[in-house]
Amino acid sequence: MNTKLTKIISGLFVATAAFQTASAGNITDIKVSSLPNKQKIVKVSFDKEIVNPTGFVTSSPARIALDFEQTGISMDQQVLEYADPLLSKISAAQNSSRARLVLNLNKPGQYNTEVRGNKVWIFINESDDTVSAPARPAVKAAPAAPAKQQAAAPSTKSAVSVSKPFTPAKQQAAAPFTESVVSVSAPFSPAKQQAAASAKQQTAAPAKQQAATPAKQTNIDFRKDGKNAGIIELAALGFAGQPDISQQHDHIIVTLKNHTLPTTLQRSLDVADFKTPVQKVTLKRLNNDTQLIITTAGNWELVNKSAAPGYFTFQVLPKKQNLESGGVNNAPKTFTGRKISLDFQDVEIRTILQILAKESGMNIVASDSVNGKMTLSLKDVPWDQALDLVMQARNLDMRQQGNIVNIAPRDELLAKDKAFLQAEKDIADLGALYSQNFQLKYKNVEEFRSILRLDNADTTGNRNTLVSGRGSVLIDPATNTLIVTDTRSVIEKFRKLIDELDVPAQQVMIEARIVEAADGFSRDLGVKFGATGKKKLKNDTSAFGWGVNSGFGGDDKWGAETKINLPITAAANSISLVRAISSGALNLELSASESLSKTKTLANPRVLTQNRKEAKIESGYEIPFTVTSIANGGSSTNTELKKAVLGLTVTPNITPDGQIIMTVKINKDSPAQCASGNQTILCISTKNLNTQAMVENGGTLIVGGIYEEDNGNTLTKVPLLGDIPVIGNLFKTRGKKTDRRELLIFITPRIMGTAGNSLRY
């Protein structure tokens, strides 16, 4: 009985210890104090005991990042700024699994940590420039406490520095982290923790050896600031240019031209838990370029800046729908001026405008109609917001040209604007007309007829907005030329429009491989390459009852594993995808299977087509049919040809992020014998499939499920003896043959015009 009770109590202690280990603490307070020798102490308080954090140090920019596993943040202010020669700012952020503290430094530094009960002390000092200096502990050791106190409040020390090499003595006191970037969106795996632990035991290499092999890598990091903005930091070592930034709906696409990203560095960070406008950050390779795709939600604005060559920061700020307005439509405004305080009573408005002009450095010109007095009491308000409040209170408005601001009553400015627009209209109606010929290089001139709506320009009086009332546009299909006659400003608009639209269309090389495989080959192929699939775009399976059950699933890893979904029930799942990294291995597998007589390649056509243009491939023959027609009491017989082909029609659509959406139509026609009354006539058996799927550039779409069966019965007998009843069965041999083969179609699209996608034969 005592033994069982002891086991139960021991189990409770173990469960309690495990619960305490897994339970999360919260960061409740951060305080900073100074020590001699230019050291700083950052004291991080928790509502319960916490384990020693893990972290890393960067020297450009100078920064220390600490991660607290299974920890939350319970502070009103998560960004703390300091006017200190060493420490400039502390930022706190969290996700579902951990919290991160980022210490921004003004110069490269190193740190030690101590865990004292429910506090973590972080000792920060500058990196030691003297390599051969004698060893000294970075932080003085705390006096020895009694055994009970040590058990109640354990103290663990660690030191990290990557900006300067260690001497042998320093190696005993501090061990450097070798991991350069730790993402705040993905928790540490046990493998990473073991790698970090082993890195602590390694010694630092000499400075010359580190400089001889620079780590030219591309990394991303995400954090949240005090304004609930998402900050994405992109480090692209070796990239000296400026990135191309574009916006596609809720995506911000940053492209580094001619900067190749290794496949192992492609990653995707899910940062939706941080409650910022940024939902997801993806770093991927697109041909010879590197793309950073920022997925957003809600209203936001982007602020980007470059800290140093190869280092870029993108801040996605949330836009708040507030009552700040400068007009009737209540459009939100953002005020960025220097904060000022004003306290006036019964002061002339012109005097207030004069004070705001001095505070802002702007040249403010007030109309003679601006007069009156007002009482104003503002504290720590941006000067541009104070100016906006004054104008709203007195029904004023402003027009800015460069560094000069003209302020007048709103009605007066509207009257001036109306007069100015009327003058421009009069000039357009009375100005000289010019003629300009635009010969298009890539687009068909007939396409511009629909773009410019030239056919609907005169019947109802609703002319095209680009052409003025006196202008005209002529089209010459023979020379592919637009002849525009209008004012100089309209012709310039045409020039800009044509420069944007008359560009070469992207082309796609579509390679199809039609393979006849033995029954069970598709199942073996799926087992070899692994199965995946969660999404689909669109499919029309009325002909076969086929289903589309594969696509790019939720796996964001870009490893070397292949992605093919050819399950055992091929009739229910007959359309699958192969990623671009695995297309070469798939071709080798098909070649090997053909050498073993498991497959037979019927056709391997290639066709080059433009983006969103249909490409058609057919292979087969035409069957003659006799058609009898009766007219005017007589009959005539004609022979018509009907196609019995294996046809493939593909229309590619290139997406902005380099994927390809393919609309595929497949028809398999073959001659067959059909019964018509007591006769057997020749007919055509047809099978059709229409589907739409998204494939990455260089990936492969696999379509299967078309089966052909060849059934036959054979009878071999001995002459005469085999015809004897009953006994004749001893002299007969019956055979039954069933041959079932599957038709597989492999479609591989490649975007042409980029390196690595040249024609291959």
From Swiss-Prot:
It is a peripheral membrane protein. Keywords: Cell outer membrane, Competence, Membrane, Protein transport, Signal, Transport. The keyword Oxidoreductase does not apply. Residues 135-157, 193-221 are annotated as: Disordered. InterPro entries: AMIN_dom, GspD/PilQ, NolW-like, NolW-like_sf, Pilus_4_PilQ, Secretin/TonB_short_N, T2SS/T3SS_dom, T2SS_GspD_CS. SMART domains: STN. Residues 1-24 form the signal peptide. Its main location: membrane. It is found in: Cell outer membrane. One of its GO terms (biological process) is protein secretion. PROSITE patterns: T2SP_D. The keyword Ligase does not apply. Residues 135-154, 193-218 have a biased composition (Low complexity). One of its GO terms (cellular component) is cell outer membrane. NCBIfam families: IV_pilus_PilQ. PANTHER family: DNA UTILIZATION PROTEIN HOFQ, PROTEIN TRANSPORT PROTEIN HOFQ. Homododecamer. Tetramer of trimer. Required for type IV pilus biogenesis and competence. Could function as a pore for exit of the pilus but also as a channel for entry of heme and antimicrobial agents and uptake of transforming DNA. Belongs to the bacterial secretin family. PilQ subfamily. This is Type IV pilus biogenesis and competence protein PilQ. It comes from Neisseria meningitidis serogroup A / serotype 4A (strain DSM 15465 / Z2491).
